[in-house]
C-alpha cells in the first residue's frame, strides 16, 4: 500500500512538475532560455511555457497537453503564474471571482456587524467549496443566481470601490507632492541658516572692531539675522498647516461621522486605560518582610526589581474594572 501511495505522489508531482524552471511539454528551461515565461490556465492550472501556448492554442481551443488532463483550454485564458504554490494561485483566483459578485460592505448592512459577519461566513463557505470541489454545481448555480438578482447592487458597489480607490490615490499623490515641497524648503532653509551663521560670525567680528559693547553687537546681529530670513519659512509653515488639515483626510472623516456608530463588542479591559488611579500606595504603613528581603538580594536588584512595582500591580489587579458597569457596556 505504501508503494501505491508513493507512486500516486510521484504521479501528482510529475503532473504539476517539480522543476519550476522547465516546461514539462517542450523541456525548455531558464538555464538555456532565460527569457522563457510560464503560463497557467484557470481551468486546470497546469504550467506551460509561452511558446507551447502559442503553438498549441493559436488555432483555437484545444485539449490540455498534460496526459492526465481532459480540460479544453483557450489561449486568451492563460495568465502568468504569480504564486509558486498552484493551490494558492487557484484560491486567489476563486476569491477574486467570488468577491466580484459578493462585494457588499458593512454600509450595506447599516453597520450591523453581526449580519455582515454572517454574510462573510457565507462567502467563505462558497470559496471553500469551489476551492475543494465540494458541491461545485450547486455552488456555481448559487453564485450565478445571486449575480443575476443583484446586478444593480453589484455595479453600485463596484463604482463605490472605484471612487474610494481614486480618492485614496489622489490623497497619496497630494501628500507625496506636499512632502516633496517640504523637503525642498527644508533644504533651502538649512542652506540659508548656514549662510546666516557664517555672515553673523563675520559681522560680529567687524562690529567689535569699532565697538566695545559686545552684548549690544551680538543682539544687533541677531535681530538682523531674524529680518534676513526668507519667505521659505513661511511657506514651510503653510505646507505644515496644509498637511495637518489634509482636505482628503477631512473628507474621509466626514464620511465616517455620517455613518452610524459601530456596535463595538464588550471588552473587560476598558479599565486598563484609566489615567487616574483609584488608589495611592503608602509603603510606610505597610510592612511586608518577604518583599523587603527581596530588595536586598543582588539577583533581584540586577533585574530592576522594586517593591512599589509589586504593590502597584497587585492594587491595579484589585481595582481594575470597578468603574465598569457590565449592564451598560453589553
Swiss-Prot record:
Output the Gene Ontology terms for molecular function.
Answer: cyclin-dependent protein serine/threonine kinase activator activity; zinc ion binding
| Signal peptide bounds | none
Zinc is among the record's keywords: yes
CDD domains of this UniProt entry?
RING-HC_TFB3-like
Q: Quote the cellular component terms of the Gene Ontology held in the record.
A: transcription factor TFIIK complex
Per the record, the zinc finger regions (RING-type) lie at 23-68
Q: Determine the domain of life of the protein's source.
A: Eukaryota
- Any idea which UniProt keywords this protein has? Metal-binding, Nucleus, Transcription, Transcription regulation, Zinc, Zinc-finger
UniProt keyword Protein transport present: no
Quote the Pfam families the UniProt record gives: MAT1, zf-C3HC4_5
A Gene Ontology biological process noted in the UniProt record is:
regulation of transcription by RNA polymerase II
Q: Where in the cell is it found?
A: Nucleus
Describe its function.
Answer: Acts as a component of the general transcription and DNA repair factor IIH (TFIIH or factor B), which is essential for both basal and activated transcription, and is involved in nucleotide excision repair (NER) of damaged DNA. TFIIH as CTD kinase activity and DNA-dependent ATPase activity, and is essential for polymerase II transcription.
Q: What is this protein called?
A: RNA polymerase II transcription factor B subunit 3
Amino acid at each position: 500500500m505504501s508503494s501505491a501511495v508513493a507512486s500516486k505522489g510521484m504521479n501528482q508531482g510529475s503532473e504539476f512538475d517539480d522543476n519550476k524552471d522547465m516546461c514539462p511539454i517542450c523541456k525548455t528551461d531558464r538555464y538555456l532560455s532565460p527569457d522563457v515565461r510560464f503560463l497557467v490556465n484557470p481551468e486546470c492550472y497546469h504550467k506551460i511555457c509561452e511558446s507551447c501556448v502559442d503553438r498549441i492554442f493559436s488555432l483555437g481551443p484545444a485539449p490540455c497537453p498534460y496526459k492526465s488532463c481532459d480540460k479544453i483550454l483557450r489561449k486568451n485564458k492563460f495568465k502568468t503564474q504569480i504564486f509558486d504554490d498552484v493551490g494558492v494561485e487557484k484560491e486567489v483566483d476563486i476569491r477574486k471571482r467570488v468577491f466580484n459578485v459578493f462585494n457588499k460592505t458593512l454600509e450595506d448592512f447599516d453597520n450591523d456587524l453581526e449580519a455582515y459577519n454572517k454574510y462573510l461566513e457565507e462567502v467563505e463557505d462558497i470559496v471553500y467549496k469551489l476551492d475543494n470541489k465540494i458541491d461545485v454545481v450547486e455552488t456555481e448555480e448559487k453564485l450565478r443566481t445571486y449575480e443575476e438578482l443583484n446586478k444593480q447592487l453589484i455595479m453600485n458597489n463596484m463604482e463605490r470601490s472605484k471612487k474610494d480607490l481614486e480618492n485614496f490615490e489622489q490623497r497619496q499623490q497630494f501628500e507625496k507632492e506636499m512632502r516633496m515641497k517640504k523637503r525642498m524648503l527644508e533644504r533651502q532653509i538649512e542652506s540659508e541658516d548656514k549662510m546666516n551663521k557664517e555672515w553673523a560670525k563675520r559681522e560680529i567680528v567687524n562690529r567689535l572692531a569699532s565697538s566695545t559693547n559686545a552684548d549690544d553687537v551680538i543682539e544687533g546681529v541677531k535681530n538682523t539675522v531674524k529680518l534676513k530670513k526668507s519667505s521659505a519659512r513661511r511657506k514651510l509653515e503653510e505646507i505644515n498647516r496644509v498637511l495637518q488639515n489634509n482636505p482628503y483626510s477631512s473628507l474621509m472623516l466626514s464620511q465616517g461621522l455620517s455613518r452610524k456608530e459601530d456596535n463595538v463588542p464588550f471588552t473587560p479591559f476598558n479599565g486598563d486605560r484609566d489615567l487616574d488611579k483609584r488608589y495611592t500606595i503608602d509603603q510606610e504603613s505597610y510592612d511586608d518582610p518577604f518583599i523587603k528581603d527581596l530588595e536586598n538580594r543582588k539577583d533581584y536588584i540586577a533585574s530592576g526589581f522594586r517593591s512599589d512595582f509589586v504593590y502597584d500591580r497587585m492594587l491595579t489587579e484589585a481595582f481594575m474594572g470597578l468603574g465598569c458597569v457590565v449592564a451598560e457596556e453589553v
